[in-house]
């Protein structure tokens, strides 16, 4: 059977921009989103498969009760550095702890190619920032695949780097969905009540039938056309992906920034906050307007 339902679950700011990477949004917000994903994925009519970034391991405890093959991870860094499995809230999965795939597209193709006996119905969930969701949305538009889009929208802007997505990757119409209520004494209860919880469907691309036929004919001709022996193209990562701080020549940001005279303890260098690995902050977003 293969994949019958595809869901993309992510975060949006007031400008409908996604955080570029996981470290560009608050760990508390990712933890809440992953918890909601686990609740929504508990559908009785299919097997849920949740794809997430590897650097959300310490926040993805609600997903770890799923069987290992149904909770694959993607190492979304564009560099080939060894995974950081020990330091910070955005530490990655240890080797062999979870099933690894190249990206969400590879997971979708694998599930479609899988032919177990008896056939299984898969509900695919792609949960993460732009470095995971944007390449998959581009692929879905290319193959004319409809996607259910589920998001938590904040009224502020991201602390880190945002990634604006084309409007064709967003649903035209959305309705509200109800999150699983937080405990009455939850420290983020008041803050989470200010957010919008949006659900919509991203429709497939509007390519005409003639264009699809021409593309099919070109691919058929290319199969039988002789090609000179040339080395294969070098694989490059998607532009949305970003290397680690060491590859960019920047030092790791410590947990506590030293204070200097005239600066408060909560003030951090805005250059470090945007370009480097975001330090741990007590808030989720920078308010755009001053109260």
UniProtKB/Swiss-Prot annotation:
Q: Where are the annotated segments for Disordered?
A: 251-270
Question: Where are the N-acetylglycine residues found in this chain?
Answer: 2
Domain of life assignment: Viruses
Q: Does the keyword Acetylation apply?
A: yes
One Pfam family of this chain: US2
**Which keywords does this Swiss-Prot/TrEMBL entry list?**
Acetylation, Host cytoplasm, Host nucleus, Host-virus interaction
Where in or outside the cell is it found? Host cytoplasm; Host nucleus
InterPro entries, sorted: Herpes_US2_varicellovirus, Ig-like_dom_sf
Q: Which family does it belong to?
A: Belongs to the herpesviridae HHV-1 US2 protein family.
Q: Assembly and partners? A: Interacts with host KRT18.
Please state what the protein is called: Protein US2
């Amino acid at each position: 059977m293969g994949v019958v339902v595809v869901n993309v679950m992510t975060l949006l700011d007031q400008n409908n921009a996604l955080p570029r990477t996981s470290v560009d949004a608050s760990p508390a917000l990712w933890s809440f989103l992953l918890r909601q994903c686990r609740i929504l994925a508990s559908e009785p009519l299919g097997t849920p498969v949740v794809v997430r970034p590897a650097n959300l391991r310490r926040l993805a405890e609600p997903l770890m009760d799923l069987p290992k093959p149904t909770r694959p991870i993607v190492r979304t860094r564009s560099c080939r550095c060894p995974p950081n499995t020990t330091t910070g809230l955005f530490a990655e999965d240890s080797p062999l702890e979870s099933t690894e795939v190249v990206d969400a597209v590879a997971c979708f193709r694998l599930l479609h190619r899988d032919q177990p006996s008896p056939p299984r119905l898969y509900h695919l969930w792609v949960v993460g920032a732009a470095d995971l969701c944007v390449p998959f949305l581009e692929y879905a538009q290319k193959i004319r695949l409809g996607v259910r889009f589920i998001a938590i929208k904040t009224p502020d802007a991201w602390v880190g780097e945002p990634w604006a997505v084309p409007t064709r990757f967003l649903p035209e119409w959305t309705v509200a969905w109800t999150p699983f209520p937080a405990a009455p004494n939850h420290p983020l209860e008041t803050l989470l009540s200010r957010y919008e919880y949006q659900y919509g469907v991203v429709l497939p691309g509007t390519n005409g039938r003639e264009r699809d036929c021409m593309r099919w004919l070109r691919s058929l001709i290319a199969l039988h056309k002789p090609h000179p022996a040339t080395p294969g193209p070098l694989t490059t990562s998607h532009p949305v992906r970003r290397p680690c701080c060491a590859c960019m020549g920047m030092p790791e940001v410590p947990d506590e920034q030293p204070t200097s005279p005239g600066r408060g303890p909560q003030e951090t260098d805005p250059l470090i906050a945007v370009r480097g690995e975001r330090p741990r902050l007590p808030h989720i977003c920078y308010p755009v307007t001053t109260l």
